[in-house]
A protein has these predicted regions:
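Eukaryotic scaffold/interaction segments
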Residues: 2-804
Length: 804
């Protein structure tokens, strides 16, 4: 075709050199052609002849006999019809020819193949139809560009698709058979049979293309019934799986099914179906049965947790993360189990609740277990992490002894003599302990106990190292702030200052020639308020020599610091006694004596402890055995009595020493009922408890391979109930002041506040130390109103104002 462009034919009367368009498509030699400005109407017969030519060509294309056709001529003829306003005739004719071919030939072939190579026949017909429509579209390209656009109808190719869809694919039994065939093949493959995947893929692609610009045909004719059938299939399979398998096996089978369906969709279904079919599998195999799966007896979440099934838990977490509320369901089950385990550990009847170290170690082991699950099974999920923290906070605070026991555990780790542990290992344990500390709601109670235990470590020189102690205080400071640790840091300062004072005192003794009666005294001067000293002066009748040595120090100290007061605190001191044992006791002899010792004392700002020694020897004894006995100040006071008396009853000892009953019982238990290598005294009768009628004497048969023998004080595994009540009363008293201080701080800043908001802010301010109850806060508010720090507003009694 030699026109420069189609518009050249509309440029008026102009002579152009070209080929003429023959009426019946025959090619003639070149002749001049005159095109006039007004096109004449074509003769009807001429139009019919052109259409007959085009119709014949279309039919030949459909029969695959297109090799002898001149597509250039056919294009010109179609162009001529459209140009002369016969586009509708051409469009309608095309529709009729294509419809007739599909109805009479293609559909009949497909119907005959319903039970024999159906998909192959349909696919062949579909491919042939697509090929023919591409050729027809090329011939009728001008009609697509002009008539189709002007009249807003389907283009040639899409028209062919629509006719194929309606006359073949969606024709009655063909549509049903296609659906059932595809669904049947998928079902067979699910059962493990081998099917022609390419045939299914071709059919699905055909349905997608027949939707033209949407997926409606594919969705209605295949996907929707496919998803419905799949839901029914997996609904039945889930029941079978649950009945026959454990939770872990069930999870693995579900994972396999999801992978199968995903792979199936990628290989021969439309890619958009993948997410939909996977969602169906997740719904039927997971979501509907979530609770059943996690609660499976002997295989569910609890079983996995009990038996460290880390990998199985990870599989369950991964699987349940696919469905809404899946992770919450697993999390709730884990939480319930964790709370049960925690409650069992902290309840009074559990054996560990009488042993602080075992109590805390069990909690740390439980935390380690669930941290392991968190990392390796639950992908460090922040919700699971928060759940574990919340659960630990819940059951740790069920037991009011937790603050005390946590402090005792730290005390155990920071004492000298921890076997088989490096400083790095101790550091790791203390870091874990700090995690438990964060869960404590009564941190002020912990502070009180920690102060007591730290005092004993410092005063008795039991700390594994100053660095470890200061490192622990640094951890507490980071967690709670400097106010929490200021007193603890003050205790360390006192020890440093005391060392300097003792150096000065020793120089004073040398220069003044003071007589300390052989007592090598060491005093710790403690600042009231920093140390857990008793408010009332403890009762204890000190032996003469230690008392005289202490009095010498008192005079020296008060001469340098006039206006201060020193009070002995014997419960915090210790002593080294030089002891001599003269052999096994004879009926007629009184053997055994305690020779002059060195002693150490601890003095507080109003408190001090000291030990002293007196020498005396008995006769009629065997070869003497000398030992240095390391004891507490109370134990020293008891032992020194036996330098003057062979036998003493409990009541006599109490009368002579004036030691508080509770402390005296512990001292005697350590001396007479400890390990065989530490029994300095003998008790009669040999009962399990110290009683007022018991009689005591020196164990002349005492022997030890060690020259220096340390008498282990019967350490309280925790406070006794009376002690605990006393501590609780002190804590409650301190809390009153802290609550009132918080109320005043808030009201001073805000001037006016409603009751509920004030309670909330006070609770939030004090949360780092303890959780005050609204009732207690209300009482403290009323107390401040009585003392005229606050006032109620006249218009609303639930609103308070600050009184400057």
């Amino acid at each position: 075709m030699d026109y420069q462009n189609e518009d050249d034919m509309r440029q008026g009367s102009r002579v152009v050199q070209t080929h003429t368009i023959p009426a019946l498509g025959l090619i003639h030699k070149s002749n001049p052609l005159i095109i006039r400005s007004t096109l004449t109407t074509m003769d009807e017969k001429y139009v019919e002849s052109i259409w007959a030519l085009l119709k014949s060509a279309i039919q030949e294309i459909q029969k695959k006999n297109n090799s002898g056709l001149s597509f250039e001529e056919l294009y010109r003829n179609a162009y001529t019809m459209v140009l002369h306003k016969y586009g509708e005739r051409l469009y309608t004719g095309l529709k009729e020819v294509v419809t007739q071919h599909l109805e009479n030939k293609v559909r009949e072939d497909v119907l005959r193949s319903l039970h024999n190579n159906f998909l192959q026949t349909l696919n062949l017909a579909w491919n042939d139809h697509q090929t023919s429509m591409v050729m027809i579209r090329d011939i009728l390209m001008y009609m697509d560009r002009v008539y189709v656009q002007q009249n807003d109808v389907d283009n040639v190719y899409n028209l062919g698709l629509i006719i194929f869809r309606d006359q073949v694919v969606r024709y009655g039994c063909v549509r049903d058979h296609l659906r059932e065939t595809l669904l049947g093949m998928v079902a067979r493959e699910r059962r493990g049979e081998v099917v022609d995947r390419s045939a299914i893929k071709n059919a699905c692609q055909m349905l997608m293309l027949l939707g033209i610009n949407n997926r409606q045909v594919y969705e209605e004719d295949f996907e929707r019934p496919f998803l419905q059938q799949s839901a029914e299939f997996y609904r039945m399979e889930s029941q079978k799986f649950l009945a026959e398998n454990s939770a872990s096996v069930y999870i693995k089978k579900v994972e396999a099914r999801i992978c199968e369906e995903s792979e199936r969709a990628k290989h021969y279904l439309d890619e958009s179906t993948e997410s939909r079919i996977v969602e169906v599998v997740e719904e039927e195999l997971i979501k509907i049965h979530m609770k059943t799966i996690v609660e499976m007896e002997n295989s569910g979440v609890v079983h996995m947790l009990k038996n460290q099934k880390t990998e199985d838990l990870g599989c369950m977490y991964k699987l349940f993360s696919r469905v809404s509320d899946g992770l919450r369901t697993v999390c709730d089950c884990v939480s319930q189990f964790l709370r049960e385990q925690g409650r069992a550990l902290v309840q009074e009847e559990h054996e560990s609740t009488t042993n602080a170290v075992l109590y805390v170690q069990n909690l740390l082991d439980l935390k380690d277990r669930f941290d392991h699950f968190l990392h390796y099974s639950f992908n460090n999920d922040k919700n699971y992490k928060q759940m574990i923290a919340s659960d630990f906070e819940y059951f740790l605070n069920l037991n009011p002894k937790s603050p005390e026991y946590l402090s005792l555990f730290i005390d155990d780790k920071l004492k000298k003599g921890v076997k088989g542990m490096t400083e790095q290992e101790i550091e790791g344990i203390l870091d874990k302990t700090m995690v438990l500390f964060r869960f404590l709601q009564e941190k002020d109670v912990f502070e009180r106990y920690y102060k007591q235990h730290l005092a004993k470590r410092l005063l008795l020189n039991k700390s594994v190292s100053d660095d470890s102690e200061k490192n622990m205080i640094s951890k507490l400071k980071t967690e709670c702030g400097c106010q929490f640790t200021s007193k603890l840091e003050g205790m360390f300062k006192d020890i440093t200052v005391s060392n300097t004072i003792m150096d000065e005192f020793k120089d004073h003794v040398l220069t003044s020639g003071a007589n300390l009666h052989g007592v090598d005294i060491s005093v710790r001067v403690l600042t009231t308020g920093f140390w857990p000293t008793q408010s009332a002066t403890p009762k204890c009748s000190m032996p003469t020599a230690p008392r005289d040595a202490f009095d010498a120090f008192r005079r020296f100290y008060l001469a340098k610091h006039s206006g201060r007061q020193l009070t002995l605190q014997p419960q915090l001191g210790s002593a080294d006694l030089n002891a001599v044992f003269y052999g096994p006791r004879r009926e007629e002899s009184n053997c055994g004596g305690l020779d002059t010792p060195s002693s150490s004392s601890s003095i507080g700002n109003g408190s001090s402890t000291s030990g002293s020694q007196v020498s005396q020897r008995s006769s009629q004894c065997n070869t003497p055995r000398k030992h240095i006995i390391q004891v507490s100040t109370y134990q020293m006071c008891v032992l020194m009595l036996f330098n003057k008396r062979e036998r003493l009853t409990y009541e006599e000892i109490q009368g002579e020493t004036d030691i508080p009953e509770r402390d005296l019982v512990r001292a005697l238990q350590s001396l007479a009922m400890g390990k065989a290598t530490q029994r300095i005294l003998l008790k009669h009768p040999r009962t399990k408890e110290i009683e007022s009628t018991n009689c005591f004497c020196v164990n002349d048969s005492f022997t030890s391979k060690l020259h220096r023998v340390k008498i282990q004080t019967v350490a309280a595994k925790g406070e006794s109930e009376p002690e605990r009540r006393e501590t609780r009363n002190k804590v409650d008293e301190d809390r009153k002041h802290e609550i009132e201080a918080a109320i005043v701080r808030i009201m001073k800043a805000r001037k006016r506040m409603p009751h509920n908001i004030l309670v909330t802010e006070v609770t939030e301010q004090l949360r780092g130390r303890f959780l005050p109850s609204p009732v207690i806060i209300k009482k403290r508010i009323e107390g401040l109103i009585e003392r005229e720090y606050l006032a109620r507003t006249p218009e609303d009694r639930k609103v308070y104002t600050y009184v400057a």
